[in-house]
Regions:
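NAD(P)H dinucleotide-binding glycine-rich loop of Rossmann-like/cofactor-binding domains
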Residues: 42, 75, 83-144
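Mid-domain Rossmann-like dinucleotide-binding core that forms the NAD(H)/NADP(H) cofactor-binding site
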Residues: 77, 115-190
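N-terminal glycine-rich beta->alpha transition that marks the start or flank
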Residues: 17-63
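A glycine-/small-residue-rich N-terminal strand-loop-strand element
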Residues: 63-87
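C-terminal capping/lid region of NAD(P)-dependent oxidoreductase domains
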Residues: 287-296, 304-323
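Short amphipathic alpha-helix with an adjacent loop that forms part of the alpha/beta core around
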Residues: 193-201
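Glycine-rich phosphate-binding loop and adjacent beta-alpha segment
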Residues: 168, 214-289, 322-323
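NAD(P)H cofactor-binding loop motif with strongest signal on the N-terminal glycine-rich segment
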Residues: 144-145, 211, 234
């Protein structure tokens, strides 16, 4: 089979590699498309190795058709259209994945577009609901509202009855966020998100943060009493300084989470999250409350260009690579 091989951060080539095969409890997927994530960019640069035992091929989500199943797999069969959450291996013609991380393509969603769903759906649902228990009427602040995660989080939060505030870096992205249901839109280039939240709300009950260190102190300022800051990215750095007094005064919680390194099965596992997404998010997609936001579709041979577009924030929503 062929797959993308990262010879350097700027040289991603489509090459022959050993064939993937379904082991016990696994599903082999003939890939139609792969979603692009910042973790893929970091892995290509040698800064984010895959978990032990995972494929060293880039790619953490795909859509495609079941080609084969390993021993003990009863829920999936050859020919079914599926999408899947991966620990790696997605930028390829075939990928093997634990059966519990496979999802049916949602009703009404094109097969290629479904490649942009597993990572955002699992990240958003696990953090907003399974970790932070976002509820009706609460205020959610999403940094990077025009991103794949941001655009999905807006829709899910609105479906749950929450009020949504977002930050983004252009008027076009802010308008896009409003169309998805964001109530408060803040251009981080020339507005203070802390001041806006204080003006228009009691503060954020929950912040979903991709920035990390750069926003740490201001995120605490933006929280409501008993608020929660959930950090899922480090685009603004890994080391920050925090006034513990402010944290204590607000009875705030700071939570760091990651998806890729979770175990396949058991409590708080990928399988548990995937099944929760299937039970709760897939119906939202089926009835139109949530839809995949695909900002660009490119041939997988252009993976390097896709990575550069993602780093430059030159896309709204997700990028998918077709195989």
């Amino acid at each position: 089979m062929r797959a993308i091989v990262a010879e350097s951060p700027d040289q991603l080539s489509w090459q022959e590699v050993p064939d993937a095969a379904a082991g016990p409890g696994e599903v082999l997927i003939k890939v139609a498309a792969a979603g692009v994530n910042r973790a893929d960019v970091l892995q290509a640069a040698g800064k984010y190795p895959p978990p032990p035992g995972a494929s060293d091929i880039i790619g953490m989500e795909v859509s495609g058709v079941v080609a084969d199943t390993g021993g003990g797999v009863a829920d999936w069969s050859a020919g079914q259209e599926v999408c899947a959450l991966l620990a790696g291996g997605g930028y390829a013609e075939y990928v093997a994945v634990p059966a519990g991380q496979v999802l049916p393509v949602p009703d009404g969603v094109e097969l290629v577009d479904a490649a942009g769903l597993p990572e955002v759906a699992c990240t958003v649902w696990s953090n907003l609901v399974m970790v932070a228990h976002l509820g009706k009427g609460q205020v959610l602040l999403v940094h990077g509202g025009g991103s794949g995660i941001g655009s999905h989080a807006i829709q899910v939060a609105r479906a749950l009855g929450a009020r949504v505030a977002v930050t983004a870096g252009s008027a076009e992205k802010l308008e896009f966020c409003r169309e998805l249901g964001a109530e408060i839109t803040i251009n981080y280039r020339d507005e203070d998100f802390v001041a806006r939240l204080r003006e228009e709300t009691h503060g954020a009950d929950l912040i979903l943060d991709i920035m990390g260190a750069a926003y740490l102190d201001r995120n605490i300022d933006a929280l409501a009493t008993d608020g929660q800051l959930v950090i899922i990215g480090m685009q603004g750095g890994i080391t920050g300084e925090l006034n513990i007094g402010k944290l204590l005064a607000k009875r705030a919680r700071v939570i760091g989470t990651t998806l890729r390194a979770r175990p396949v099965t058991g409590p708080n596992s990928k399988t548990e999250i995937v099944q929760a997404v299937r039970a709760s998010v897939w119906p939202m997609i089926a009835d139109g409350r949530v839809r995949p936001i695909i900002g660009a579709s490119m041939p997988i041979q252009q993976a390097g260009d896709a990575h550069r577009r993602l780093v430059a924030s030159d896309v709204t929503g997700k990028i998918v690579l077709t195989v």
